[in-house]
């Protein structure tokens, strides 16, 4: 995603080295890959309404405008199990699980090929964790998504993953 530049090693996507990609080329690549952050409390801009947060990617990537954005945001909210009438609310008005659903909707908005799910349930109550994991699984089946799941919780990995790589000190060891 190039949120930070790599300090060592190389990252490739579809045979293209990501280091050095800039401008429109980087924006085009980012449409294909999205992220769901670990902490739903700090990953949503507190000054933006939910509808704006989710619709922002649609506008940045010229995928929709005006009423089209509103319709797509409503569709995405429903897709992740939230009512479309929450679009005008702010992130602080939601629980952690609801915020993570908003983050998932935001990631889905641009129809990515894959989503990096960085510890997507570690900051949530145990009672909510399985709901979010099951939502991610349902979305994977419905849209043919690929997830790169980052997790220290082996139960989460077992529930979600079809292939696993174990890393230690920045290297795949298993």
Q: Predicted segment positions?
A:
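Conserved ABC ATPase "signature" region
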Residues: 17, 67-85
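A short, proline-enriched helix->beta-strand linker immediately N-terminal to the Walker B motif
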Residues: 109-113, 129
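A short, surface-exposed alpha-helical micro-motif characterized by mixed small hydrophobic
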Residues: 157-159
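Conserved signature/switch motifs of ABC ATPase nucleotide-binding domains
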Residues: 31, 92, 110, 134, ...
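Conserved ABC transporter NBD signature motif
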Residues: 9-17, 29
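Hydrophobic anchor residue at the start of the ABC signature
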Residues: 104, 132
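Conserved ABC ATPase signature
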Residues: 90-94, 98
